[in-house]
Swiss-Prot record:
Predominant location: cytoplasm
Gene name of the encoded protein: rbfA
The protein's name in its UniProt record: Ribosome-binding factor A
Region annotation (Disordered) ranges: 112-137
UniProt superkingdom: Bacteria
InterPro entries documented for this protein: KH_dom-like_a/b, RbfA, RbfA_dom_sf, Ribosome-bd_factorA_CS
UniProt entry keywords in alphabetical sequence: Cytoplasm, Ribosome biogenesis
GO biological process, alphabetically ordered: maturation of SSU-rRNA
Lineage, opening ranks: Bacteria, Pseudomonadati, Coprothermobacterota, Coprothermobacteria, Coprothermobacterales
Amino acid composition bias (Basic and acidic residues), ranges on this chain: 127-137
Subunit structure: Monomer. Binds 30S ribosomal subunits, but not 50S ribosomal subunits or 70S ribosomes.
Length: 137
């Protein structure tokens, strides 16, 4: 399959999956799922679906729910997009967003520590300067 066609097809699959999970599923847990990426095999028989969920939601339960409906979802994707095969879906939790949030927080904490150190060093310099001017020759 040509790379451009594959990319467009993957994008269409991603949109269709999101729509199916939001509109067709009765399981409320699946309403909190965001499809972050999909990878379709060249023969279109296998589809790896990466998803994330809101913090505080039980990702293991959500994964189990996704596993229960993957046959239906696969068939709907194939029917809607007129695929030759209904791809075998494998869902994988995508923690990259959570990792990114943690990294940003760590960087912010480091920045705050650096600011505190700079403030302390400026205070030390001003104290040293004041002491020097108060000395008698």
């Amino acid at each position: 399959m040509k790379p451009l066609r594959k990319e467009r097809l993957q994008q269409a699959i991603k949109q269709e999956l999101s729509k199916i999970l939001l509109e067709d599923m009765n399981d409320e847990r699946l309403k909190f799922v965001t499809i972050t990426d999909v990878e379709l095999s060249d023969d279109q028989k296998y589809l790896k679906v990466y998803f994330s969920t809101m913090p505080g939601k039980n990702s293991e339960q959500i994964l189990q729910s996704l596993e229960r409906v993957k046959g239906y979802v696969s068939g709907e994707v194939a029917r809607t997009l007129r695929l030759r095969f209904a791809p075998e879906i494998k869902f994988e939790l995508d923690n990259s967003i959570e990792r990114g949030v943690r990294m940003v927080k760590l960087l912010e904490d480091l920045e705050k520590k650096d600011e505190v150190k700079e403030d302390e060093s400026h205070e030390d310099e001003s104290t040293d300067h004041t002491e020097e001017t108060n000395e008698e020759p």
